[in-house]
Amino acid sequence: MSDVPPRRRKPAWLKVKAPAPRQYRATGALLDELELHTVCREARCPNKGECYSSGTATFLILGDTCTRGCRFCAVETGGAAGLCALDSDEPRRVAEAARRLALRHVVITSVTRDDLPDGGAAQFAAAVAAVRERLPGATVEVLIPDLGGDDAALAAVLAARPDVLNHNLETVVRLYAEVRPQAQYHRSLQVLRRAAAWARGAAPARPPAPGPARPAPPTPARPLVKSGLMVGLGETADEVAAVLADCAAAAVDLVTIGQYLQPERGCLPVARYVAPEEFREYE
C-alpha cells in the first residue's frame, strides 16, 4: 500500500470555472510559438485555465529547471547537467508575447539558478527593458528568487526600474526547513529589506561584489516592494502575523496571502483549507 496520504477534497469556495476553450488554446499556442515557459504550465498552477482563458500568463525565464527543490513546487529540479544555457533572445520573446496578448501588467519570474554568478539578474533586467520598449504603456512586475543574497545582483534588477519588485517569503519561519530546505527565511527577508531601502533612494548598506558599481538609481516613481506567503501548510495564525510584522518592519509595501494547493502527488500535502473568513482577518 502507498504511504502517500490521499488528497483532501477541495471546499466549495475553491472551485473554479472551466476554461474558455478558444482563448485558452490561443494563449497556449502563442507561448508555444515563441518557445516561452510559464509558471502556469511548469508549476502546474491551478489558475492556469483562468489565466490562459483571459489571455494572461506569468512568464518564467531562465529555463524550466530549478537548482532548488522546494517541496510545494512542481517545477522540475536538476543539477548543472540539466540546466539550459542563457537564451539572449528570451527577453525579446517575452516582450513580444506581452505585446501580442495586449497585457497591461506583465509579470516575469524565473526558476532559481544558483549556477549563475548573478542568479539571473541580468536576464531579468533585459526582460524588463524589452517590455518597456515594445509595450511602453504596461507596468512590469518581477518576481525574483533570492539571488543568493547578492547585493549587486539585486541592484542590477532594481536598476531596470520594474514597477513592482516581488520576492516571496512563501511560508513561516518554523516551516522553512520542511517547505524550502535550500532557502533561508532571514536571507529572503533581507532581500526585501534592501530592496525597500534602495527603492526609497537609500545607498546600499554594504559595497557590492568587486567589479563595476551597480547601485539602484533613484526613480521618479519608485518600485513597490511586494512579498507573498501560502497558508494551509500547518502554520498558525500567530506565525502568519509574525511574518506580516517582519514585512512591515522591512518596509514592504504589499503582501499577498494565498491558499496552498498541492500541484502533484510528490509535493507536500495540504494540511488544511483556510476559510474565507480567516483571510479577511489577515487583511
Segments (PLM) and residue ranges:
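Canonical Radical SAM [4Fe-4S] cluster-binding loop centered on the CxxxCxxC motif
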Residues: 7-14, 50-90
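Low-complexity, compositionally biased segments
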Residues: 67, 149, 154, 166-173, ...
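Short, glycine/serine-rich, charged loops/turns that create anion-binding
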Residues: 66, 112-115, 147, 234, ...
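Short connector loops/turns at beta-strand edges and beta->alpha or beta->beta junctions
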Residues: 64-67, 103, 170-172, 260-262
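Auxiliary Fe-S-binding modules of radical SAM enzymes
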Residues: 1-58, 92-102, 126-137, 159-160, ...
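Short polybasic linear motifs
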Residues: 201, 209, 215, 219
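Core AdoMet radical
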Residues: 74-93, 98-196, 226, 230, ...
